[in-house]
Amino acid sequence: MNPDPIAYPHRDEMPGSHRAAERVVPTILAITGPVRSVVDVGGGDGGWLRVFQQHGVEEVLLIDCPEVEPHLVIDRRYLEPCDLSRDLPAPRRFDLALCLECAEHLPAHRAVQLVEWLTKSADIVVFSAAIPGQGGKGHIHLRFPDFWNELFARRGYRRHDVLRPRIVADRAVAWWYRQNTFVFASSGAKLLSGQTEFLPNEFYLIHKDIAENLV
């Protein structure tokens, strides 16, 4: 029996997520180069993975709650249902891992395990999480980027602020993606060279359009 479609609380946010994916996925691939496999943790209906598939990615996996199943825009065989607030499945290796605006929905004590799982799954992680003042439905763990940067650094992953310079002024992309999204990469990861990157002292950079949305 399918889960009740009404039970998934973020269904109204999916159209905006789809628009963002259409704009941002090509930019991600311009930074990473071609990838064959992508896992998305907390990816809702699979909208971001669908765009990656449209760009030639062969293997995708969505990890999210079972309530997303009636809303999927990718084949249901790509969903691994999981209560992210309690546990994650055994990690598998992918070329790229996504975790976008998911971490703030999880209890604070899950943060370390989430980052460990992501870094065990891929050498390149595209990550965003809500910041204090952002507001939003079901947000229980709001942190500034340096909190997450420290957790990734413990795992040997360096922050590359190469995505925000390309999307921060794009109003077709929801402001939280423009503000919060970073690339984290292991020492062995290969990113395309010549990327524009915000300087470390701009780590908390908030675009004037985005500042208007903070509470």
Regions found by a protein language model. Name each.
Residues 1-98, 109-121, 135, 141-151, ...:
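Conserved N-terminal segment of class I S-adenosyl-L-methionine
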Residues 102:
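Hydrophobic adenine-recognition pocket in adenosine-nucleotide-binding enzymes
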Residues 105-106:
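A short His-aromatic
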Residues 122-132:
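Conserved beta-strand signature within the Rossmann-like core of class I S-adenosyl-L-methionine
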